[in-house]
Amino acid sequence: MANDQDPNKSLINDALTRSMSEFYDDDDDNDSDMCRANDEGEDVFDLPLKVGVSQSRNFSEVNDVLDPLSSLHGPSKKVRFEQQKQQQQHQQLHNDFNTDFNLKSPSSKKMGVEQLIQSANEINDYLANNIDKVNSFNSELLSGSGKLPGRVKSDTATQGTGRLDSMSNFALSDTELDNDDDNYLLDPLANASSTTPTVEHHGYSLLDKALSTSDKEKIYTNKVNSNSQIDTDNHSHESGNTTNNETDENESSEILDYTKFDSFPYPPSSAPNGEPPDLKVLSIECEQENEKELRRISLLLDHYESIPKIPELSDDEALSKFRENIELILQLSKKINDNANTLAISSEDPQKFVNFVMKNPPSLSFRDFIDRIQNKCMFGAVVYLGATYLLQLVFLTRDEMDGPIKLKAKLQEDQAHRIIISTIRIATKLLEDFVHSQNYICKVFGISKRLLTKLEISFMASVNFDGLMITCEKLEKTLHILDDTRQALGNT
């Protein structure tokens, strides 16, 4: 059966071959430039085709269908490709590949043996010098608390959204602030359009409210012409009528070059009859006040031994100490009327703390307020230790070196929130590398940026700027002062 089919198949192939040759005979003359005979006498076509690696994969399904039919048409025409061009292209690709390989080869970046040994020695020396820090860092990360170190903080709360977390602002009233930006110019010479300086043009509004009368006399000094009339009772609304229209323009007020003195001009409203105080007397008074404040700090701190080491407290423990300190000072303040011995002999002027009094009651207690700050800002223990130290510095002292703790100033409940704001913000700026932005911290505190600046200035003036030097020894003494405060409250 197979023998019968083979002759038939050969006959069919011969017939198809003859028909195809007759079909191409008519076009041989026209296609002489495209077709020529090779050594074997077969027709060869020069076609512009390119061979690729993946060409065999193209149209695989069509090739499978055409393969059986190709045998019916006899031997296929051989196509000769331009081998020379192929070789050139292949050589070019080979050269490009070698170039890229040399560029990417890691062997080109290998260091010499001496350089490698030197680098290894440097790494070993670094690890030997810092192995203690590496181990302590690992122990903190792997501790059971599951919290990162205090300085790795975030602007967003990572804890649950409870009642305290969901409130972005609350009623810490700052309605006493004026909306006019000109009233808060700290540069007294910022407004040069007026030839006669007035209280409002000098921009003393912010500092008038931030500082007490005694503090203003320390910081300011100014000379105003006696012919210039200033309405001190109504300067916030009628400052345009404060000068005498009959005063000659050539006799306008003379402003001293206050850069030559140790203190700045004080508001004319505070000067009696517009005359500046004697600078020598003012300097002596400032020195006496500074010595008095330094003695208060010394009586409070020098009672204890100086240990140059920061107390090892967790964030929650330091926060608890800060909260307890506020509660003890509030309790001592309530007992002043019953026991006069609670207040120190050299007590502070209550007017220094007027700016911390809130106009409206807050919607959160000071305890919840502290928790809110920690949930939103996640401060470390050192911040609350610093805030505790500043709080003790302002409100606590002693009459004698070995005497009991007494109040230097009375703390009221309507002052607690703003005192907390001031102590935490200043302690953060003094002790932390990571400080939240002014916009974010104001949202957490629930106050405006102006009021925050005002509270910071007021608090720093209350410590006379001498208590802002915080050391490890002072932070360590805060815990001893807290223990003595508990004893003072128990004795009363």
Curated annotation (Swiss-Prot):
Localization in the cell: Cytoplasm; Nucleus
Modified-residue entries (Phosphoserine), positions: 32
InterPro entries: Cyclin_PHO80-like (IPR013922)
Pfam families noted in UniProt: Cyclin
Biased composition (Polar residues): 8-20
Function, as annotated: Cyclin partner of the cyclin-dependent kinase (CDK) PHO85. Together with cyclin PCL10, negatively controls glycogen accumulation under favorable growth conditions. Involved in phosphorylation and negative regulation of glycogen synthase GSY2. Also has minor GLC8 kinase activity.
Family statement: Belongs to the cyclin family. PHO80 subfamily.
Protein's name according to its UniProt entry: PHO85 cyclin-8
Biological source species: Saccharomyces cerevisiae (strain ATCC 204508 / S288c)
Lineage: Eukaryota, Fungi, Dikarya, Ascomycota, Saccharomycotina
